[in-house]
């Protein structure tokens, strides 16, 4: 009588592999859902922390941080970072002119924030630092990164267009890009999220829908238009928030931004264009897990 050989047959092995593949097909989406839910919760906590920091800033400064692009190279996301951690990450100077060069003038002659590297033996520099406010966020937990790659260090984008690449932004909790930070002979890899968009409401305006100039409305897309136009951080894919496919194209370019901020509860009162959310304060927008502004997974403060 022949002895039976031990082991699995090919059919049995294939069956096991099919079962494993099916289980992975079920488990992986579930794991991704759990992971994204955890990141969403973390992002909501970050927004709560930022909102507390903004209120502390307002208490010192008398107003919310601005979100304009008066000089073409410095927008709302960057101005929020200056307000909460400082132009040079060393706290906010209440004399700020909100320029990307940290000076009173475009030529960079009359500085508000001292030139870098900071000379701590200079009494003028020491006094400047002593008079600063904040930082209002703990720097190690602020998720703050340089906007672009420069000789001064790595950043989120290789090309920042018209925006000053050396200025900082606060990033969300959805890791999108690895950055290698160097400190002497040591290197550290950190995961940076997508920049958090910040828009301050124009509380003196009572204009939202057409007619009228878009930059006179309660919120103005131009406050972060250059940053949004860079596309998704990982591949440059256009952000839906910057599009014009909205049902109300007459609201002005980009119409999607204005539709995105409509408080639907106000439509029966104000008509089809409604009224914006947070009309007396500000808006924060995280691109969410997909890294795109203007999609269903965005996290906002409204």
Language model features with spans:
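N-terminal single-pass transmembrane signal-anchor helix
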Residues: 4-34, 43, 47
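N-terminal pilin/flagellin-like segments and related low-complexity appendage regions
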Residues: 44-302
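Conserved aromatic-histidine-acidic binding/catalytic patches
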Residues: 15, 35-39, 72, 272
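Hydrophobic helical segment of the DHp/HisKA dimerization and phosphotransfer domain
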Residues: 31-34, 38, 54
